[in-house]
UniProtKB/Swiss-Prot annotation:
Converts 2C-methyl-D-erythritol 2,4-cyclodiphosphate (ME-2,4cPP) into 1-hydroxy-2-methyl-2-(E)-butenyl 4-diphosphate. Binds 1 [4Fe-4S] cluster. [4Fe-4S] cluster binds at C311, C314, C357, E364. Pathway: Isoprenoid biosynthesis; isopentenyl diphosphate biosynthesis via DXP pathway; isopentenyl diphosphate from 1-deoxy-D-xylulose 5-phosphate: step 5/6. The gene is ispG. Belongs to the IspG family. It comes from Stenotrophomonas maltophilia (strain R551-3). GO terms for molecular function: 4 iron, 4 sulfur cluster binding; 4-hydroxy-3-methylbut-2-en-1-yl diphosphate synthase activity (ferredoxin); 4-hydroxy-3-methylbut-2-enyl-diphosphate synthase activity (flavodoxin); iron ion binding. InterPro entries: Dihydropteroate_synth-like_sf, IspG_bac, IspG_bac-typ, NO2/SO3_Rdtase_4Fe4S_sf. NCBIfam families: ispG_gcpE, PRK00366.1. This is 4-hydroxy-3-methylbut-2-en-1-yl diphosphate synthase (flavodoxin). Its cofactor is [4Fe-4S] cluster.
Length: 421
C-alpha cells in the first residue's frame, strides 16, 4: 500500500508545469490525454428518454463549447433513446461524443439495448455500485466486455459518495494493524484511489487496452480532491478526468472548483474537466461549460475566446459606462467567436481592456491588443484607444461603444488571416 504522497517539484522558471504523460484515449473524434489539450465536458440534466429535450440541451452545451457531453442512462427507455439522440444530433450537424453514465444496472441496460452500447462514444462506470458481493466482478466484466466488443473507451469513476464499502472496510481493518494508523480521512482517500486503480487493472485483465481507460476519483472537498489526484497521478499513467463531485451553487461552486482544479492543472495533472455546478433557478446549464473554459484560459491551458480585462471601479469611476461597455465587449466577442474560430484562427488569443479612469487605464490598455481608457470623474470626456501598445485614436460622443466594437472587428479582420476554406 502506498504510504506517502510526494508533492511535485515546480519547474525552475515557476511559469509552467510539464503535462503528466498518459495514454491517449480516443473518444469519438476527441483525444483525451497523451499530451493533448485539456478537454471540456458537461452533463445534461434532462430525462434522457425525452429525446427532444435531451437533444436540445446537448446542442446548447455543444454550442457553448462542450467537447463531450454525458447523459444519464438509468432505464431501458433511456438506453433506447441514445441512438435516436445521436441520429437527431447528426441531422443538426452536431458530432459531439456522448458518454453514457451508468450506475447499478448498466450491464442489464446494454444487454437489453445493444444499440445504445454501439451509439455511445464512452461508458462511465462507478466501481462503487456496479455490483455488490459476488455479483460485482461479474457485472463489471459484462460492462467491460461491451466496451471491448464495440471498441469503446471507459471512464472508471470512483466517488466517495458511493464508495466500495467492502474495500473501505478491508482498508480500515488493515489500518488498525499499522504501527502508526492513518486518520479515517486518509484511509477513505486510499479506498477511493484503490477502487479506481484496482478496477482499471481488472479491466485490463479482461482485455480492455490501457489506452481505452480514463480514471476519476471524485470528492466534494477542495483539499481532499487535490490530495487524491496527486496520489492517483503518481500511481498510474491513465488519463484523468477532474472535477469536484458536487461543487455547489453560484459563486461557491465556481470558487470551489477553481480552487481545486487550478492547483492540479498547474501541476500538469488532468486531461479532461467538468465543473459540476448546481444551476440557479432560471440559469442555463451552459454556465458550467463557460466556467470550465474560463478556468482553462485563465490558467494558461487553452484559449477559447478573447480575454476582456476590466477595472473593478472605485470612487474615480462614478459613471457606469465602463461597466456597460465591458459587458457589451464580452458579449460581442463570445457571439463572434464561433465565426472567428473558422475564419480567423488565433483570434481567441486576443486580449482586450476596458478601463474606467486615467490611473491604470492607459497602462493596462497598452498591455492589451486593443484597450480603451474611459474618462473617470472630473477627467476630460475623451477615451483614447490603444492598439498593440500604440495610441491609435481617441473616441468621443454617444457612439463610443459601437465605435470600439468596430475597431475590434477591424483588428480581427486585419490581424488574423482569413481562412478561405
Amino acid at each position: 500500500m502506498h504510504d506517502a504522497v510526494t508533492r511535485p517539484t515546480p519547474p525552475s522558471d515557476a511559469t509552467s508545469w510539464p503535462r503528466r504523460q498518459t495514454h491517449a484515449v480516443q473518444i469519438g473524434g476527441v483525444t483525451v490525454g497523451g499530451g493533448k489539450p485539456v478537454v471540456v465536458q458537461s452533463m445534461t440534466n434532462t430525462d434522457t428518454s425525452d429525446v427532444a429535450s435531451s437533444v436540445k440541451q446537448v446542442a446548447e452545451l455543444w454550442r457553448a463549447g462542450s467537447e463531450m457531453v454525458r447523459l444519464t442512462v438509468n432505464t431501458v427507455e433511456a438506453a433506447a433513446a441514445i441512438p435516436r439522440i445521436v441520429d437527431k444530433l447528426a441531422m443538426m450537424g452536431i458530432d459531439v461524443p456522448l458518454i453514457g453514465d451508468f450506475h447499478y444496472n448498466g450491464h442489464q441496460l446494454l444487454t437489453a439495448e445493444p444499440a445504445c452500447a454501439e451509439a455511445l462514444a464512452k461508458y462511465r462506470i462507478n466501481p462503487g455500485n456496479v455490483g455488490f458481493g459476488k455479483k460485482k466482478d461479474l457485472q463489471f466484466a459484462q460492462l467491460i466486455e461491451f466496451a471491448i466488443r464495440y471498441n469503446k473507451p471507459v471512464r472508471i469513476g470512483a466517488n466517495w459518495g458511493s464508495l466500495d464499502q467492502a474495500l473501505a472496510a478491508k482498508l480500515m481493518d488493515e489500518n488498525n494493524h499499522r504501527e502508526q494508523p492513518w486518520d479515517a480521512g486518509r484511509v477513505l482517500r486510499e479506498a477511493l484511489i484503490r477502487s479506481a486503480l484496482d478496477s482499471a487493472e481488472q479491466a485490463v485483465e479482461i482485455g480492455l487496452p490501457r489506452d481505452r481507460i480514463v480514471l476519476s476519483a471524485k470528492v466534494s472537498g477542495v483539499q481532499e480532491l487535490i490530495a487524491v489526484y496527486r496520489d492517483l497521478a503518481q500511481r498510474s499513467d491513465f488519463a484523468l478526468h477532474l472535477g469536484l463531485t458536487e461543487a455547489g451553487i453560484g459563486s461557491k461552486g465556481i470558487v470551489a472548483s477553481s480552487a481545486a482544479l487550478s492547483v492540479l492543472l498547474q501541476e500538469g495533472i488532468g486531461d479532461t474537466i467538468r465543473i459540476s455546478l448546481t444551476p440557479e433557478p432560471g440559469q442555463s446549464r451552459t454556465q458550467e461549460v463557460i466556467v470550465a473554459q474560463e478556468l482553462l484560459q485563465t490558467t494558461g491551458q487553452r484559449a477559447f475566446t478573447p480575454l476582456v480585462t476590466a477595472c473593478p471601479g472605485c470612487g474615480r469611476t462614478t459613471s457606469e459606462f465602463f461597466q456597460e461597455l465591458a459587458k457589451v465587449v464580452q458579449s460581442h466577442v463570445r457571439e463572434k467567436m464561433p465565426m472567428w474560430k473558422i475564419q480567423h484562427p488565433g483570434a481567441e488569443n486576443m486580449t482586450l481592456a476596458v478601463m474606467g479612469c486615467i490611473v491604470n487605464g492607459p497602462g493596462e490598455s497598452r498591455h492589451a491588443n486593443i484597450g480603451i481608457s474611459l474618462p473617470g470623474t472630473g477627467e476630460t470626456p475623451a477615451a483614447p484607444v490603444f492598439v498593440d501598445g500604440e495610441k491609435k485614436v481617441t473616441l468621443r460622443g454617444e457612439n463610443i461603444a459601437q465605435d470600439f466594437v468596430a475597431l475590434i472587428d477591424d483588428y480581427v479582420e486585419r490581424t488574423y488571416v482569413r481562412n478561405a476554406g
